């Protein structure tokens, strides 16, 4: 069973290729990593499914977390995979949902010219260092106004999701960088990428993939994740106070 209370859950999907009957097929690894009230990270779910990333598989992952005992989460951090935001909100209605800022910055390079993208990045860095949500909201609106003519459709989408790009500003300063991206999941993805390259660019079977996932998870949980990062250690009392305040009010 899982701890019923978590400060944060980071979710992300990673594509890999598996060899099956002399053919390569795509699979998606659905990862969920929790940050406990003790400040330690733990892998909650790591499931490989054939085919492309899809909402039904994400529903299965989130439902599985609840079935295993998870009840209260303060903040979910995820990318803006189409349709995932309302699903996360439906399963955990009292959690903030933060959309990954790294994915946002990458998208700017797709939607804006090189010059505009550079300015977008500069303005976003200023938002990330905002004192509080109110200042961040104002700067975010100014950013959307600035690029409304260059990319009206995308700016419209950003405005609708403003609270989900700025949720990290509600939390202690030492945690804002961690809470604004899904980079925590990259600790596992990075190890898998090395294993993939060393295996010739793909995994030789589903069993091989599961075995190597287990190795990657164990090396983190038994290694560097055993010691609290400095930012987490300094912010932990405040994070737990925020957790207690929020969920006492929602009982």
Per-range role (PLM):
Residues 1-17, 21, 88, 97-102, ...:
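Conserved, well-ordered core segments of regulatory domains
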Residues 129-251:
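Acidic/histidine-rich catalytic cores and adjacent linkers
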Residues 16, 83-84, 107, 190, ...:
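General alpha-helical segment detector with a strong preference for membrane-spanning helices
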Residues 1-77, 82, 86, 91-94, ...:
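RNase H-like nuclease fold core
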Residues 48, 75-82, 87-125:
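Conserved beta-strand -> loop -> alpha-helix junction used to position metal-binding or nucleic-acid-contacting
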Residues 55-58, 113, 117, 206, ...:
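Short, charged, low-complexity patches
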Residues 66, 70, 89-93, 109, ...:
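Hydrophobic/aromatic-lined pockets within catalytic cores
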């Amino acid at each position: 069973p899982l701890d019923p209370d978590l400060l944060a859950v980071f979710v992300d999907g990673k594509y890999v290729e598996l060899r099956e009957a002399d053919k390569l097929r795509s699979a998606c690894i659905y990862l969920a990593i929790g940050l406990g009230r003790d400040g330690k990270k733990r892998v909650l779910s790591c499931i490989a499914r054939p085919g492309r990333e899809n909402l039904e598989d994400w529903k299965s992952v989130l439902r599985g977390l609840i079935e295993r005992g998870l009840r209260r989460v303060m903040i979910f951090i995820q990318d803006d995979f189409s349709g995932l935001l309302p699903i996360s909100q439906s399963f955990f209605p009292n959690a903030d949902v933060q959309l990954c800022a790294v994915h946002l910055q990458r998208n700017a390079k797709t939607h804006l010219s090189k010059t505009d993208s550079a300015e977008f990045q500069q303005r976003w860095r200023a938002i990330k260092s905002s004192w509080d949500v109110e200042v961040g909201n104002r700067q975010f609106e100014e950013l959307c106004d600035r690029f409304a003519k260059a990319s009206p459709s995308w700016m419209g989408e950003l405005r609708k999701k403003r609270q989900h790009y700025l949720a990290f500003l509600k939390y202690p300063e030492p945690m804002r960088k961690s809470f604004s991206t899904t980079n925590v999941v990259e600790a596992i993805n990075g190890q898998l990428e090395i294993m993939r390259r060393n295996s010739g660019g793909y995994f030789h079977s589903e069993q091989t993939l599961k075995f190597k996932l287990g190795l990657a998870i164990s090396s983190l949980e038994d290694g560097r994740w055993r010691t609290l990062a400095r930012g987490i250690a300094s912010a932990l009392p405040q994070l737990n106070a925020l957790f207690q305040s929020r969920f006492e009010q929602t009982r």
